């Protein structure tokens, strides 16, 4: 998979790209990540990428020309640049289902905003999808792009040592993940549930499903709406 990232601050990605799963996936050729500073497409000698908003108001707005020129240059240089995803608090929520859809693509382009956002003409005529990583505002789209990068890359075949690792995680079946335990079996008087030590795989499966339902009901009850079949599979 190829992922292009359009940003004014490519140095913010240096750390995340050089550690853990993303680093290993890049080294293995599972994913190629290209950082593009769209300031390089600014049209004046000062490399200006923003200007004051029409109609007044605080802050600065990213100009359309550098973004359009950078994206069009990117698209003309390769057969498939993939859809352009703009990271924005106004976008649709990033969900595991959306992450799976993105991970199935051969290519993807992430656009990081700054300041008061993008000129709306970029959103209307260039962006394929606006995506938000949560109901809060960040200083720029770079942290959100890193979230998308990590979530997508770890789903790519060969990115994890054990592809089974992603199958039992939160949201994969509409539920949050069940509790996990490891050695020692007893710690400060707190014991690991006996069923996990029993070796009875069906009993363990049922316990995990029940715990998933309970955790979801406690922390994300919205996920259970209209999921009577899932709730029936776990008993509180």
Regions found by a protein language model. Name each.
Residues 1-74, 197, 201-225, 235:
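N-terminal nucleotide/polyanion-binding subdomain common to many enzyme families
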Residues 63-114, 120:
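S-adenosyl-L-methionine/SAH cofactor-binding core of RNA-modifying enzymes
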Residues 58-61, 93, 115, 119, ...:
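Gly/Ser/Thr-rich beta-alpha loop segments that engage phosphate groups in nucleotides
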Residues 143, 155-194:
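Internal, active-site/partner-interface "lid" segment
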Residues 20-24, 100-104, 126:
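Short, solvent-exposed amphipathic alpha-helical segments in soluble enzyme
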Residues 118, 122-169:
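Structured adenosyl-cofactor binding patch, chiefly the S-adenosyl-L-methionine
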Residues 4-6, 34-36, 85, 108-109, ...:
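Hydrophobic/aromatic beta-strand patches that form the interior of the parallel beta-sheet core
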Residues 8, 38, 87-90, 112-115, ...:
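Fold-independent oxyanion-binding glycine-rich loops
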């Amino acid at each position: 998979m190829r992922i292009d990232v359009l940003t004014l601050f490519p140095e913010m990605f240096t750390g995340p790209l050089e550690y853990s799963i993303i680093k290993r996936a890049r080294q293995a050729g599972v994913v190629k990540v290209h950082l593009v500073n769209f300031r390089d497409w600014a049209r004046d000698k000062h490399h200006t990428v923003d200007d004051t908003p029409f109609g007044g108001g605080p802050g600065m707005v990213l100009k359309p020309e550098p973004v359009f020129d950078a994206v069009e240059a990117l698209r003309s240089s390769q057969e498939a640049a993939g859809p352009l995803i703009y990271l924005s608090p106004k976008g649709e929520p990033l969900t595991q289902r959306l992450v799976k859809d993105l991970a199935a693509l051969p290519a993807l382009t992430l656009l990081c905003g700054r300041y008061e956002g993008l000129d709306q003409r970029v959103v209307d005529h260039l962006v394929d999808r606006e995506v938000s990583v949560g109901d809060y505002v960040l200083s720029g789209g770079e942290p959100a792009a890193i979230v998308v990068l990590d979530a997508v890359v770890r789903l790519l075949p060969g990115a994890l040592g054990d592809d089974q690792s992603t199958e039992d995680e939160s949201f994969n079946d509409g539920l949050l993940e069940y509790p996990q335990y490891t050695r020692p079996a007893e710690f400060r008087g707190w014991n690991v549930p006996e069923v996990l030590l029993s070796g009875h795989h069906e009993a363990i499966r049922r316990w995990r499903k029940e715990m998933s339902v309970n955790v979801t009901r406690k922390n994300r009850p919205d996920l259970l709406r209209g999921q009577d079949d899932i709730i029936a599979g776990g008993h509180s």
